[in-house]
Amino acid sequence: MSYQVLARKWRPQTFADVVGQEHVLTALANGLSLGRIHHAYLFSGTRGVGKTSIARLLAKGLNCETGITATPCGVCDNCREIEQGRFVDLIEIDAASRTKVEDTRDLLDNVQYAPARGRFKVYLIDEVHMLSRHSFNALLKTLEEPPEHVKFLLATTDPQKLPVTILSRCLQFHLKALDVEQIRHQLEHILNEEHIAHEPRALQLLARAAEGSLRDALSLTDQAIASGDGQVSTQAVSAMLGTLDDDQALSLVEAMVEANGERVMALINEAAARGIEWEALLVEMLGLLHRIAMVQLSPAALGNDMAAIELRMRELARTIPPTDIQLYYQTLLIGRKELPYAPDRRMGVEMTLLRALAFHPRMPLPEPEVPRQSFAPVAPTAVMTPTQVPPQPQSAPQQAPTVPLPETTSQVLAARQQLQRVQGATKAKKSEPAAATRARPVNNAALERLASVTDRVQARPVPSALEKAPAKKEAYRWKATTPVMQQKEVVATPKALKKALEHEKTPELAAKLAAEAIERDPWAAQVSQLSLPKLVEQVALNAWKEESDNAVCLHLRSSQRHLNNRGAQQKLAEALSMLKGSTVELTIVEDDNPAVRTPLEWRQAIYEEKLAQARESIIADNNIQTLRRFFDAELDEESIRPI
């Protein structure tokens, strides 16, 4: 028997054999079971995800001799002929090779005839988006009202190219691209059934290279079996796909984490010798960094495909802080984005890794070295005249004080003091220009620079060669920190001050509000008759009264509790007793009941009523309406104030 490729040999024969696409299979199975069968189905999705296979399974379910079912028997003549591709009532058409309108018309001429053997005549049109505009127009009427014995199954990888009139006449099912784990699991199942030796990491590489297409994965598996001499090995798959193996990619990550630039460049040279795809190199490193981050979150995230490098991955996850992983990941991701703009792909990868090394948080930072400067001894007298004799030999050194100054420092300070004295004497004796002319010139700027350097050296003593410690790495602590929220300072801008002043009530308006509050609130009227200090009066204005016989209870707002004290209660009780003519027992409790208003709340309510009336009056004003209508003026309602 001739060899059959895996993609054809393992084509699904039942709905249960289809990998993924549960959302499509469930809808089709329910429709077949309930007998709710549409006359046109459209399957869309990327290549190799099962569009044609599902369409054939649907045709098998429609024409199985056991009846319309979601689980065809697979043994009757109709099922076997559909599997073998020779069922007379399943007409498969490649629209890419039959795009002319004449081909479509010839096809539609046979639609009216009943099926020869099956229950339905099924037209399976693959790559239907390749049909011409005239072909779509010819198909339109038949697709809208086909005979009862005709079903259309359309498959396309580009549904956007189909006319909306075609889309509206079909049930649309979009097949999703398979994820890497689904493809890897199916490859493992097939290779186990075929008794072919394989490595988990090799299957992971094949599943990732398939990019969501199971057919591409099976084709690559056939190629890997041929490359690996009858088995699927990681080395053969890496060489076939032009990708790095785990050890090399992981070694690059380790060298980058250790800030070992020489090791990184050596590994780059090894990768170049293998002729790998440079973007694939960055993708592999990004994948490893992602796995390391996932292991830090959940130790069980490392799958069986990483068994060969599991220990090294867990060690990296243990030692690298999460912030470093995010830094490396973002650096490599940006490098991959900028790779097309690099003069050379290898150059772009090298610069990306060098950027990661440059931003390494543990790079050694050498301490700044202060150069040790030595100065020649300066004589105490900085200004010499020609009549002076040569300096005498220095006397024996005296005993140093308790806190000695450096010799150079003391000499420079003495020279500066002598210079100041000489300058003062020169100003006083301007009548002796001859002696000043014969004197040796003094470099004032040099002495000032020397003194400033000496002051800095004195303020920060230079460690000796024996005490100088080697350069230390930057202190880098990996610990969770909660940033202290800084309080936003309130800045009083002129605009804010103006707005606040606009809301201030004028004395006339405040008096008018108080008078109207007295008319509406008996307690406000009673407070106006009391002779109280201003601070005690605020207690009464911020409370509402509850009275029974000679007992008065004031319900004070909690925001004004600071006004409530024994002295205020005593003065308020005396004023109430004097007004009533008998002794009043006063109690004050805190109460924020909004149903009862205090005198101040009455004033605010009256103010808001007047403000609403003023706003309505201005809006209804004829002059204002004319300005807004003819000059497109805008009314600033926030500036409206009652008078």
Curated annotation (Swiss-Prot):
Bilayer-crossing regions: none
Enzyme Commission designation: 2.7.7.7
List of residues binding ATP: 45-52
Keywords assigned by UniProt, alphabetized: ATP-binding, DNA replication, DNA-directed DNA polymerase, Metal-binding, Nucleotide-binding, Nucleotidyltransferase, Transferase, Zinc
Span list, region Disordered: 385-404
S-S pairs: none
GO cellular component: DNA polymerase III complex; DNA polymerase III, clamp loader complex; replisome
One GO BP annotation of this record: DNA-templated DNA replication
SUPFAM superfamilies, per database record: P-loop containing nucleoside triphosphate hydrolases, post-AAA+ oligomerization domain-like
Residues involved in Zn(2+) binding: 64, 73, 76, 79
Source organism superkingdom: Bacteria
Coiled coil: none
Alphabetical list of InterPro entries matching this protein: AAA+_ATPase, ClpA/B, DNA_pol3_clamp-load_cplx_C, DNA_pol3_tau_IV, DNA_pol_III_gamma-3, DNA_pol_III_sug/sutau_N, DNA_pol_III_tau_dom-5, DNA_Rep/Repair_Clamp_Loader
GO function terms (MF aspect): ATP binding; ATP hydrolysis activity; DNA binding; DNA clamp loader activity; DNA polymerase processivity factor activity; DNA-directed DNA polymerase activity; identical protein binding; metal ion binding
PANTHER family: PROTEIN STICHEL-LIKE 2, REPLICATION FACTOR C / DNA POLYMERASE III GAMMA-TAU SUBUNIT
NCBIfam families, A to Z: dnaX_nterm, PRK05563.1, PRK07994.1
Complexes and interactors: The DNA polymerase III holoenzyme complex contains at least 10 different subunits organized into 3 functionally essential subassemblies: the Pol III core, the beta sliding clamp processivity factor and the clamp-loading complex. The Pol III core (subunits alpha, epsilon and theta) contains the polymerase and the 3'-5' exonuclease proofreading activities. The polymerase is tethered to the template via the dimeric beta sliding clamp processivity factor.
Protein name per Swiss-Prot or TrEMBL: DNA polymerase III subunit tau
Protein source organism: Escherichia coli (strain K12)
